[in-house]
Design a protein with these regions (language model features):
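Active-site-adjacent substrate-recognition loops and nearby beta-strands
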Residues: 105-115, 132, 136-173, 177-181, ...
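A short, hydrophobic C-terminal helix/tail in secreted or cell-surface proteins
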Residues: 385-391
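Catalytic-core regions built around general acid/base machinery
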Residues: 113-126
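Hydrolase catalytic cores
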Residues: 43-46, 59-67, 85-93, 177-179, ...
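Subtilisin-like serine protease catalytic core
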Residues: 1-75, 92, 126, 164, ...
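Active-site core segment of subtilase-fold serine proteases
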Residues: 1-40, 91, 186-241, 245-260
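Short acidic, glycine-rich surface-loop motifs adjacent to enzyme active sites
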Residues: 85-108, 132-133
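Short, well-ordered amphipathic alpha-helical segments that serve as non-catalytic structural scaffolds
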Residues: 79-83
Length: 391
């Protein structure tokens, strides 16, 4: 186990010795603990005594930093994945990596360094990386629109009471020229799309609005407009905020907007006309990873909260996600009859465990040395049940 919060790596012998001393009362506190229980629950489903791959060897990475910041950086996840693969190479074993984590920041097209890193890892070694697509399906945190030259498009954003801050990301093609305004419930209008203006600060009552327009970069030919509304005291103004697009010359016109994850927002906060089609979370947008959604209660149905979407480029369908779904509603944790969990975080380890067992059958037992990567994904999809198209 590698604990990123302390930088300490524990061998299996050290872990067993520490746990034995703890059970015997020789030590009062454990040097590493899963405070939320999320990681333990995921691990138990994937490879616990009653889990899917109960005989698997386990590599654990506790994400985080010594400062105790609750927000995980993408670089920490990348280092964790790299650690798992390097350990697997060291022990000459295939590895199934579980990532029950996702965020909404990014263009969701698989073109970020984070997503491309995951794809490269899937092609580098005998591994399978399984990632949850998130629980944003019903969250009202995404909107897709189409700009038309000379037209005005308004999308309304409801902000509930007691929101201390919120951010809005808009991703569009750089060749599409449009003036974008943020209009407060009290009528103040702010332009947030000025190119080459750097970071722009606005002040409205007790709020500070920070915006910046980012042009194309080495890995993305589009443009990002980012705006953050932060209360300097109390909370930001609740009510209906308007995001207005006044289009000039438009060649493509397609754009997306995302808010922070639904779990961080008030239930009253969200777009009034949300689009559920691009609600998968990053890195569940990775193209070569096995991206996992959650089944609903009805046979063959997807859970309504489960994220979904396609990687698109100029309106062309490239990859549809999730690749596969697994049970993710009211899942009983093995060994804990009282506890149930819901979400794609807990559907994902079921697929990770299945991937580990397929690699054991193929690689470890000598039945198929190429049972990893895209071939393993194809085997899972081929043997799965077809989903209901109406789900």
């Amino acid at each position: 186990m590698w604990d990123q919060t302390t930088g300490i790596t524990y061998s299996d012998k050290e872990i067993n010795s520490i746990l034995e001393d703890y059970r015997n009362g020789a030590v009062k506190t454990l040097p590493a603990r899963d405070v939320t229980g999320h990681g333990n629950e995921v691990a138990v489903i994937a490879c616990g005594r009653s889990g899917v791959a109960s005989d698997a060897d386990i590599i654990i990475v506790k994400l985080g930093n010594s400062g105790g910041n609750a927000y995980i950086r993408t670089t920490q996840i990348m280092k964790g994945v790299d650690y798992c693969i390097r350990k697997a190479i060291e022990y000459s074993q295939p590895v199934a990596v579980n990532i029950s984590y996702g965020g909404t920041y990014g263009n969701h097209e698989g073109s970020s360094i984070f997503e491309m890193f995951i794809d490269d890892c899937c092609s580098t070694y005998r591994c399978s990386i399984c990632i949850g697509v998130g629980n944003e399906g019903e969250g009202r945190t995404h909107y897709s629109g189409q700009l038309v030259s000379g037209n005005v498009l308004d999308e309304e954003l409801a902000i509930g009471d007691y929101e201390p801050q919120i951010s809005i990301q808009i991703w569009k093609r750089a060749m599409d020229n449009a003036r974008i305004e943020l209009i407060a419930p009290t009528g103040e209008r702010l332009v947030i799309s000025e190119r080459n203006a750097g970071v722009v600060h606005h002040n409205i009552k007790n709020m500070r609005i920070v915006s910046k327009a980012y042009g194309p970069g080495p890995f993305y030919m589009g443009e990002e407009i980012y705006a953050a509304i932060v209360a300097t005291s109390g909370y930001i103004t609740s009510g209906i905020w308007d995001i207005r697009f006044t289009a000039a010359n438009v060649l493509d016109g397609f754009f997306n907007m995302w808010l922070p994850p639904v779990s961080t927002l008030s239930s009253a906060t969200g777009f009034l006309r949300p689009s559920p089609e691009y609600t998968f979370t990053i890195p569940g947008t990775s193209r070569r990873a096995i991206c996992v959604g959650a089944n609903g209660r009805a046979p063959g149905s997807a859970a309504t909260f489960s994220g979904r979407g396609v990687n698109v480029k100029s309106g062309l369908l490239l990859y549809a996600k999730p690749d596969i779904t697994a049970p993710g509603v009211n899942i009983r944790i093995p060994g804990n009859k009282e506890k149930t969990v819901t979400g794609t975080s807990f559907a994902t380890p079921m697929v990770t465990g299945a991937a580990a067992m397929l690699m054991e059958w193929g690689i470890v037992k000598g039945n198929d040395q190429y049972m990893y990567g895209e071939k393993l994904k194809a085997c899972l999809l081929y043997t799965s049940d077809a989903a209901d198209d109406k789900a």
